[in-house]
């Protein structure tokens, strides 16, 4: 049995107000487990996001993301103010956050917080970009590695492009994060060797 996604009719426009989440689809995985795909993030989702970002036992998350600083120690409101559009995958029975993704304007090749210098961090809120939009995604235990992310992110991309059809998407991260970069490749992203940072082992991939 393959994953199936059943869209929920809606007429939402972006950006959504802060702490707003609307169901846009039902996701049923290959084992028959049901999830809600949410556009936006309400306070319940953000609370889970913060808790998971602070979980130091999740070494994959801590080693490969800036979420401990971004969501655990930082302001969600400030992050959202940068034009971010979040999507959440929420397990229906337990209401647990299974995966989280976001899009938003960001200059091509601009690294995440984990890789920025102090001077670059001070400029983070002053970026002006319209053409290139970043895509970032996370999956959380115990749902990581269960075959959910490809279909979830593919659906999120299609939804986001309805609102921003001219946007060029890019992803970036640790070149050794085979799962994340492999997913990007399966989604049609292509590596940009000219943006590879050998010192920080950071790479970018684009989908134009």
Predicted stretch roles:
Residues 150, 175-193:
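Conserved active-site alpha-helix within GNAT-family acetyltransferase domains
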Residues 140-141, 169-181:
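Conserved beta-strand-loop-alpha-helix junction that forms the acyl-donor binding cleft
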Residues 104, 170-172, 192:
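Solvent-exposed beta-strand sheet faces enriched in polar/charged residues
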Residues 52, 159, 183-187:
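Alpha-helical interaction/dimerization surfaces of two-component signaling modules
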Residues 147, 164, 188:
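Short glycine-rich hinge loops at helix-strand junctions in the catalytic core
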Residues 124-128, 151-168:
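Conserved acyl-CoA
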Residues 136, 145-152:
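A short glycine-leucine-enriched loop at secondary-structure breakpoints
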Residues 1-141, 197-208:
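GNAT-family acyltransferases
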């Amino acid at each position: 049995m393959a994953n199936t996604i059943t869209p929920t009719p809606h007429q939402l426009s972006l950006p959504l107000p802060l702490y707003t989440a609307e169901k846009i689809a039902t996701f049923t995985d290959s084992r028959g487990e049901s999830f809600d795909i949410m556009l936006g993030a309400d306070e319940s989702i953000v609370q889970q996001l913060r808790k998971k970002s602070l979980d130091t036992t999740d070494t994959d998350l801590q080693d490969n993301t800036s979420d401990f600083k971004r969501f655990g120690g930082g302001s969600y409101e400030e992050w959202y103010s940068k034009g971010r559009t979040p999507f959440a995958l929420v397990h229906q029975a337990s209401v647990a956050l299974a995966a989280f993704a976001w899009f938003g304007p960001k200059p091509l090749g601009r690294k995440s917080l984990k890789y920025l210098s102090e001077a670059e961090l001070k400029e983070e809120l002053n970026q002006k970009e319209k053409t290139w939009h970043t895509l970032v995604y996370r999956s959380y235990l115990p749902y990581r590695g269960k075959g959910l992310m490809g279909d979830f992110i593919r659906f999120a991309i299609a939804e986001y492009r309805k609102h921003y059809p001219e946007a060029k998407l890019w992803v970036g991260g640790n070149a050794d994060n085979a799962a994340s970069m492999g997913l990007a490749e399966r989604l049609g992203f292509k590596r940009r060797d000219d943006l590879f940072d050998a010192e920080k082992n950071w790479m970018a991939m684009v989908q134009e």
